[in-house]
Amino acid sequence: MTEPIYIVYHSVDHKIEFWQDALNPLMPGIKLVTADQPEAQNAEVMITWNPPEGMIASLPNLKGVISLAQGVDHVLNGKTFPSHLKFARLIDPYMSEAMAEWVTLTVLEYHRDAATYRDAETRHDWIRLPPRIAARTTVAVMGLGAIGSVVAETLTHLKFDVIGWSRSEKSIPGVTCYHGDDGFETCLKTADILVSILPLTAATENIFNAKHFAQMKKGAAFINAGRGKQVVEADLINALDQDHLRGATLDVMVIEPLPADHPFWDHPKVNVWPHVSAQTNPESAGEQVAEAITDIRAGREPRNSVNIARGY
């Protein structure tokens, strides 16, 4: 009988059975095990979301790690990552499409004054606000990577004036793209609705702070689907309380789950989402994970390799 191919699995989001079922048709003989099982000591690959510090280094025969997300801060930030390991991330078209759906929903909530109308409904108040024109509403997408570029292009189909920012120069049809520090400031000052899909790196931690909120248009809306640690939460609350920003929709927080006593929950200008804008789907991502497992075990560089120095 052939020995199973043991792969270490760790995630708080999906039960191990979900990924086992997704990978079975693609890799017959594969067996997912947890890091505390004896078989894990012989495993060459780990697939993971948010592993505890020391877990990766404790597995002596690992050749590589696969992040069960596009972001990789959950593996790298504040944790030891052995330099000899290969490291791949997911770039799943489903996740890009899901993020585009969620951002479109939240952008339209602000564009069409949904919160105002819902509040009026509770008061049985038949009000009608002046309409906005999408072409005269500037939406800035901060982060134009694999997901952000799809989000930006999707918003152009609704005729919004879409601008975007990334660290390096990009070109996206219908989107005015900026880069560098000056470009970042231009997006802040220009956007009616600002959407962050930035990765969490040393350069982006706390990037949305009092200084940058003050540079945004008065009455602008802020949407964050990047990472919670990019926002100085007290500064955001202050910008909302001073009526500089009209509202904030947040899918990511500094601490997740968001503590029950956190002021975001009851703030009238904050919409809280539980990090569901673009969840990893084993069915759609299974092929990519199987391919990365095969490449790592064979000693090849996997597709969508992570540049550890850059953090993405």
Which residues does each PLM region occupy?
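A charged, well-structured terminal subsegment
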Residues: 102-130, 283-284, 288-291, 295
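Short acidic low-complexity segments
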Residues: 31-42, 53-56, 175-190
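NAD(P)-binding Rossmann-fold cofactor-contacting core
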Residues: 157-174
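Phosphate/diphosphate ligand-binding glycine-rich loop within oxidoreductases
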Residues: 44-118
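Glycine-rich NAD(P)-binding loop of Rossmann-like domains
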Residues: 117-150
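Rossmann-like adenosine-cofactor binding region
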Residues: 169-263
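N-terminal glycine-/charge-rich "phosphate-binding" loop or analogous flexible N-terminal tail
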Residues: 1-43
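Rossmann-like dinucleotide-binding domain for NAD(H)/NADP(H)
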Residues: 225-312
